[in-house]
Regions:
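Helix-to-loop junction immediately C-terminal to a conserved catalytic motif
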Residues: 60
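A short, surface-exposed alpha-helical micro-motif characterized by mixed small hydrophobic
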Residues: 218-220
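ABC ATPase NBD coupling module
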Residues: 20-23, 77-92, 110, 118, ...
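Conserved ABC ATPase signature
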Residues: 151-155, 159
Length: 278
């Protein structure tokens, strides 16, 4: 059986900047290539402005690459019409800000039913509702019916991000682009959301691109780490190898700038102990 893949091939993104009569070109992403396999998590690590979110936006068809290709299962994903619609049913995004990514005027169940209807038009209203409730319970918002008719302001930040994860799964996505999914949450609830993502990744055999500046979580939750610096991938490899034996000076700088480098391993031990105790 073939493995499903999401591939970025030689992605380049340039932005033209104007200042008065002068123009300049910002090379935001420079010839970046990688492949995400179903059931695997790849972390894209770098400081703000390194190009991480630009790559995410290109993968989600929110930005058009200056050059390069995005392939789903080895086929070009296209940029228009039904090709993009089919692509987006398979590739979904969890945005950074759970307070802005949900419409405050709509109920929680509406946020889930809409993509289900869009991508599965043959389902009856009852089937759509049942699928939405099932998704709420899959992300540990249980019982689902008790959350369905609430609005975003009635949920905590962590609960909202769980809804965002459920919405990403609603079309039947096989790949998730998670752009700093816990950076705006309280430290006390970050681990729970990341554990949920890890569980869903295993249970659903999802491919995940985990975008972060947090090396501790990148090490634990990823199979592979790519380090991005000014639009270039300067280092990549198995997560432990990159963290424990960094080769590039920028990776060493990121590790040196971590508030408590000794916690890079401790987080892994804590999470493993928690998962083992379930």
């Amino acid at each position: 059986m073939s493995t499903h893949t999401l591939e970025a091939r030689n992605l380049v993104k340039d932005f033209t900047r104007r200042s008065g009569l002068k123009t300049s070109v910002l090379h935001a992403v420079k010839d970046v290539s990688f492949t995400i396999e179903a059931g695997k998590t790849v972390a894209l690590v770098g400081e703000s402005g390194s190009g991480k979110s630009t790559i995410a936006r290109m993968l989600m068809k929110l930005e058009t690459p200056s050059s390069g290709q995005i392939l789903l299962d080895g086929k070009d994903s296209g940029m228009r019409g039904r090709a993009v619609e089919a692509y987006r049913s398979q590739v979904q995004m969890v945005f950074q800000d759970p307070f802005a990514s949900l419409n405050p005027f709509h109920t929680i169940v509406h946020h889930l039913e809409r993509p289900i209807r869009l991508h599965h038009p043959k389902l009856s209203s009852a089937q759509v509702r049942a699928r939405a409730i099932e998704l709420l319970e899959r992300v540990r918002l249980s019982p689902g019916e008790s959350f369905a008719e609430r609005r975003p302001h009635e949920l905590s930040g962590g609960q909202r991000q769980r809804v965002a994860i459920a919405r990403a799964l609603a079309p039947g996505a096989r790949f998730i682009v998670a752009d700093e999914p816990v950076s705006m949450l309280d430290v006390s609830i970050r681990l729970g959301v990341l554990n949920l993502l890890a569980d869903l990744q295993r249970e659903e055999n999802l491919g995940v691109l985990y975008i972060t500046h947090d090396l501790a979580t990148a090490r634990h939750f990823s199979d592979e780490i790519m380090v991005l610096y000014k639009g270039d991938v300067v280092e990549r490899g198995p997560a432990d190898d990159v963290i424990l034996n960094p080769q590039h000076e920028y990776t060493k700088t990121l590790l040196g700038a971590a508030p408590e480098p000794e916690n890079l391993g401790r987080l892994r031990d804590e999470v493993r102990a928690e998962l083992a105790g379930r």
